[in-house]
């Protein structure tokens, strides 16, 4: 595109058919194209549609099975699981030699139990596989027989596993089948997953290639091989096992059932980290995410979430733009994509399901009838769905008054008529507080967003700093641990550049933070600043704790950088020219946390009609009883839920008692209820799984 020359061109490979659809706007055009293109959904689409997604890249088999069972007890069963890291030699290494499962993550029986836990809950589980990257140390590797070549006779390089120093090469499409079928027969007999995930095939386009002896193979052949193998796996596993891939282009619709979205933003790289690149860096006056792909394919190709969290946030603060943020969830609602989470269990996991899942189930397999940019504003979008469903999304900075609601930035309102009644969900501003609500015929979820600190009460700080000369520094640290140091975690001290990338690390004695230690813990750390760091540069020290077994970081107290690292301060290399005079230290000065503007720090009770509370809980009917289930988190403060009995969506007899229940259904105690008119206050304890209100 050359706008200054008024020149725009489209390019396609090989023999192509172009279809032009004239219409008053693109949304009318895409409706016509959707109705007439003849594309049919693959066999597993009906099974994948609408399902919440556990997208799991780390963790051990046994512990993850236990965590998923907890999630299922909280009702998170209209779902599917993507299990990515399990391959025999580790993730993305020595492919295609992937079976049996990696013993470093647990036993074969534990892996089978993980799959059984999902099957018992009616939750499909997919295992991650890859037939793009062939590693030279894998059995059967041969440039001549298996690897694609460029026109000039050089092999096509594929993924570089930097952590293990291993370069892979791209498969010839005509040589994938024997390796894939060998693996799938082993996996079906040994593990029996109920879904399957193949990486890259719907993020990279089908490719042309040459063989080692100079034969040309076009991309249409590659596409037919990929598609045919997806269909073969679905038949082999049985039960219309959904086939899932990465990102989700439209070239495999009819064979492939869905993909994990990567819905990037348009704009220049900003923020920090290695995923600053994850944007469409196109200069333009304005831009916004919009449901273009789903307008064409929502009912025949199931996209999950809004993207892997690091790619979606693209260098921005994960708390404000990551997978559990209002920004991310509003994009899921805008597109009608099932919610996606990165953990098997947790407060945010349950919260996201309770807020979004009834809505996503109601939108599953519907079609988009139109998208309006209200008053010409790209950031205020109104999406009309088949069957009378309506969604309003505000991604602009100013509040938007619409359909009786006040939508803040990254707020939404959705109303979907169903046979069982109206399904409604929202993130809205209510009396100055941003809150969450979702209701359907069977459930009512509310969240007054009282602040619940996800951090462990462990906070690091620097007590003293010393420049020891010769580019060596010494830090005296104090770790205030109000709870015991957890098992399996180790401290880290990163010195980072302005993008948050690690340039070098300081070391401290790991025994100082041995598991079980508590109180004020002193430690000394040292570091040598590399010669590549020039005089005049400033670097930031960020500290935290991580699990060497899987890389997960703990959330700690202090000024978090959005990646679970606490900002402690900066060092600066002072001097003139290339001559270093000294290394100086400046403590970090915390700024107001922008996340608090989206929460309820004063814990003001919010009136949701049938219930008033600053807490977060779901109401369900159980016969003549009412069950209140708080969001899980034993470290969260208790809260009061004031029920207005006559305004509940169900006609229930007035209760006389409340019984607190454990996760396994055991009674934790009973107490009498006292009504004030039609209102009754219930004290919700974080130590209880649920509170059941009954008449006896």
Feature map (PLM): residue ranges:
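Short, aromatic- and glycine-rich surface loops/edge beta-strands on solvent-exposed regions
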Residues: 537-545, 658, 689-696
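Aromatic-lined carbohydrate-binding/catalytic grooves of carbohydrate-active enzymes
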Residues: 38-179, 189-195, 203-211
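Solvent-exposed beta-strand/loop surfaces of large extracellular or lumenal domains
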Residues: 422-426, 499-516, 659-678
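Proteolytic cleavage junctions
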Residues: 669-696
């Amino acid at each position: 595109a050359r706008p200054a020359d008024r020149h725009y061109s489209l390019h396609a490979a090989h023999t192509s058919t172009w279809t032009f659809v004239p219409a008053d706007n693109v949304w009318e055009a895409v409706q016509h194209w959707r109705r007439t293109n003849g594309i049919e959904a693959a066999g597993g689409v009906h099974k994948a549609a609408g399902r919440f997604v556990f997208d799991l890249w780390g963790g051990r088999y046994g512990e993850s099975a236990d965590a998923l069972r907890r999630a299922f007890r909280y009702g998170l069963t209209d779902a599917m699981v993507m299990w990515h890291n399990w391959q025999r030699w580790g993730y993305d290494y020595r492919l295609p030699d992937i079976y049996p499962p990696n013993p470093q993550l647990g036993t074969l029986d534990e892996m089978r139990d993980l799959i059984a836990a999902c099957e018992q809950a009616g939750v499909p589980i997919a295992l991650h596989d890859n037939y793009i990257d062939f590693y030279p140390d894998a059995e059967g590797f041969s440039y001549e027989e298996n690897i694609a070549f460029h026109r000039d006779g050089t092999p096509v390089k594929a993924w570089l596993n930097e952590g293990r120093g291993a370069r892979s090469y791209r498969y010839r499409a005509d040589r994938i089948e024997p390796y894939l079928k060998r693996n799938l027969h082993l996996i079906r007999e040994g593990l029996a997953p109920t879904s399957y995930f193949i990486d890259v095939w719907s993020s990279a386009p089908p490719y042309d290639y040459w063989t080692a002896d100079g034969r040309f193979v076009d991309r249409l052949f590659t596409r037919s091989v990929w598609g045919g193998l997806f269909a073969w796996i679905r038949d082999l596993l049985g039960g219309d096992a959904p086939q899932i891939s990465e990102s989700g282009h439209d070239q495999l619709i009819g064979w492939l059932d869905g993909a994990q979205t990567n819905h990037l933003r348009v704009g220049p790289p900003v923020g920090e980290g290695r995923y600053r690149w994850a944007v469409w860096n196109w200069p333009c006056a304005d831009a916004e995410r919009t449901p273009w792909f789903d307008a064409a394919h929502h009912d025949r190709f199931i996209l999950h979430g809004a993207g892997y969290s690091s790619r979606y946030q693209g260098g921005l603060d994960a708390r404000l733009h990551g997978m559990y943020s209002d920004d991310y969830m509003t994009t899921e609602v805008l597109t009608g994509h099932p919610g996606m989470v990165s953990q098997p269990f947790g407060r945010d996991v349950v919260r996201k399901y309770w807020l979004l899942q009834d809505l996503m189930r109601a939108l599953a397999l519907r079609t988009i009838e139109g998208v309006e940019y209200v008053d010409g504003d790209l950031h205020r979008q109104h999406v009309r769905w088949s069957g009378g469903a309506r969604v309003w999304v505000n991604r602009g900075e100013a509040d938007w008054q619409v359909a009786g609601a006040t939508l803040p930035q990254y707020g939404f309102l959705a109303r979907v008529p169903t046979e069982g009644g109206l399904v409604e969900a929202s993130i809205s501003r209510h009396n100055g507080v941003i809150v969450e609500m979702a209701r359907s015929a069977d459930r009512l979820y509310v969240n007054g967003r009282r602040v619940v600190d996800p951090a462990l009460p462990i906070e690091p700080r620097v007590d003293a700093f010393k420049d020891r000369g010769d580019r060596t520094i010494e830090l005296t640290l104090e770790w205030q641990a109000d709870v015991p140091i957890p098992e399996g975690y180790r401290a880290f001290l990163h010195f980072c550049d302005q993008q948050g990338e690690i340039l070098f690390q300081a070391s401290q004695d790991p025994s100082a933070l041995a598991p079980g230690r508590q109180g004020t813990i002193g430690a000394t750390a040292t570091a040598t600043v590399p010669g590549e760091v020039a005089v005049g540069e400033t670097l930031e020290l960020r500290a935290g704790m991580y699990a060497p077994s899987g890389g997960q970081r703990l959330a700690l107290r202090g000024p978090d950088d959005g990646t679970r690292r606490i900002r402690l301060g900066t060092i600066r290399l002072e001097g003139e020219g290339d001559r270093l005079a000294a290394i100086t230290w400046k403590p970090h000065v915390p700024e107001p946390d922008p996340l608090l503007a989206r929460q309820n720090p004063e814990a003001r009770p919010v009136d949701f009609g049938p219930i008033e509370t600053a807490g977060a809980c779901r109401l369900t009917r159980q016969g003549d009883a009412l069950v209140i289930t708080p969001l899980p988190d034993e470290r969260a403060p208790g809260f009061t839920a004031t029920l207005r009995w006559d305004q509940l969506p169900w006609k229930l007899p007035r209760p006389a008692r409340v019984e607190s229940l454990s996760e396994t259904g055991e009674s934790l105690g009973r107490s009498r209820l006292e009504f004030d008119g039609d209102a009754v206050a219930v004290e919700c304890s974080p130590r209880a799984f649920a509170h059941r209100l009954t008449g006896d």
